[in-house]
Amino acid sequence: TEFIQANAPEVRSRWCTNEKTAMEAALGMSYAGKRSLVCMKHVGMNVAADAFVNSAITGVNGGLVVLAADDPSMHSSQNEQDSRFYGKFAMIPILEPSTQQEAYDMMPYAYALSEELKLPVLMRVVTRLAHSRAEIAVHEPLAQKPLSPDNERTHWVLLPGNARRQYATLVEKQGTLLSKSEESPYNSEFNNQNSK
């Protein structure tokens, strides 16, 4: 937070009581048309689950990226839970960078995907990536989006009639999500002929 405040004063950052309130705050900004990022550990996804899963049904207005830091081998956590299961359960796009450069480059891609599909995007990183650093090639930051609230309450209030309609929309988007995944520049296969 202090780094952001010192180096990017136009970006608003905040600490929240817990992961659920952080998810709700980010979702509220997204509903108002602003891009939002919410970060938490994998076990924090359990706390944020209600707001997270329902955000896939309401959809988003401004791009929303949920960054979850998983901890394979339990270096500093009580379990090895895999956040990708939450993304699959919520039926939203999941990105998984393997290097610091990929993590940096995927963020604008994640926002573009979120805004195009009107869905939150889950970005999963692991301990070795989250607790490391490297030089990266930087690019121009994304332009800020103005507040542009969508005041149609049926989009954001999940009463049963609205929820059924919104859920049907989410299900209809699954074919598009599959196509986007197959076309993604970050979804590639490497065949190392020299590996043993």
Positions of PLM-derived features:
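Thiamine diphosphate
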Residues: 1-100, 105-107, 126-129, 142, ...
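Flexible, low-complexity linker and terminal segments
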Residues: 97-196
